Amino acid sequence: MVKRSQRVEKKAVEVNRGTWTAEEDEKLMNYVSAHGDKKWRMLPAKAGLKRCGKSCRLRWLNYLRPGIKRGNISEDEEDLIIRLHNLLGNRWSIIAGRIPGRTDNEIKNHWNTHLSKRSLTIEDLNKKHNPGIDNIDILPPTKITLTSSSDTFPVTPVCQTDQASDTNKNDVLVDSWTDLSGPDFDLEQFLSLLPMSDLCPGSNGNELEFDDFGIPRHDSKQDSFRSNDYNINYQECLDSQVWSCAFEYDDLDQFLDCQS
């Protein structure tokens, strides 16, 4: 029995290699515009091109598709490539997506040809764009010495109107003490005229105490007693009859009615 080996002879398809011609570019652009950029393996035969599908795809994506920039890469684009490469590394497709109009293949070729030999970092780029920062001289603080008596700090003068108001307030306070036995005596008005230091605890921790009639109690141990501030003697302000009758009544109103 004779065996016959059947050999299927595949006809080799002739494929052009090398630089693309203007005629080939036009054929590829016309076909992609009409049918889209899909099925690159079948595209060359349908478009009448003697190229492989990979060559057609790269030619379209890197050179012929709309939005591609022509010409050399600018200095600003180089700085952006360096910054992105320091952050992302050799991820050329991601870097190309952040630089409009440039392809990943173009950026990779430009990096390997021109930028890989430069050891530039982000700090070097910041100094390049802001050269005036390093030229700023920071002076140390200097001490100011007073050489004469005139070199003194200004002192805020005391307002004369404040002194006059304090004097008038003291006069009204003394008059209130002398009119304690009168019918028009107002205890709340009298207390409002006292300084806050008289109503609050003093520096020695003692408090101002009042008796049943609203009269401050005298404490001989307190050197800063309030009567010394105004030179007031309580027993001299009240006559002996009023002073003796003051302790016979439990109510302040009864005491004032008795004197009227």
Swiss-Prot record:
Domain of life: Eukaryota
Primary localization class, coarse: nucleus
Gene Ontology cellular-component annotations: nucleus
One of the record's GO molecular function terms: DNA binding
Coiled-coil positions: none
DNA-binding region per UniProt: 40-64, 92-115
Localization (cell): Nucleus
Database matches in SUPFAM superfamilies: Homeodomain-like
Pfam families the record matches: Myb_DNA-binding (PF00249)
InterPro entries tied to this protein: Homeodomain-like_sf (IPR009057), Myb_dom (IPR017930), Myb_TF_plants (IPR015495), SANT/Myb (IPR001005)
Keyword field: Activator, DNA-binding, Nucleus, Repeat, Transcription, Transcription regulation
Span of domain HTH myb-type: 12-64, 65-119
CDD domains linked to this entry: SANT
Chain's role: Transcription activator involved in the spatiotemporal regulation of flavonoid biosynthesis specifically in the corms of Montbretia. Activates the promoters of enzymes involved in the biosynthesis of the flavonol myricetin and the flavonol-glycoside montbretin A (MbA). MbA is a potent inhibitor of human pancreatic alpha-amylase and is being developed as drug candidate to treat type-2 diabetes.
PANTHER family reported for this sequence: TRANSCRIPTION FACTOR MYB114-LIKE (PTHR47999:SF107), TRANSCRIPTION FACTOR MYB8-RELATED-RELATED (PTHR47999)
Descriptive protein name: Transcription factor MYB4
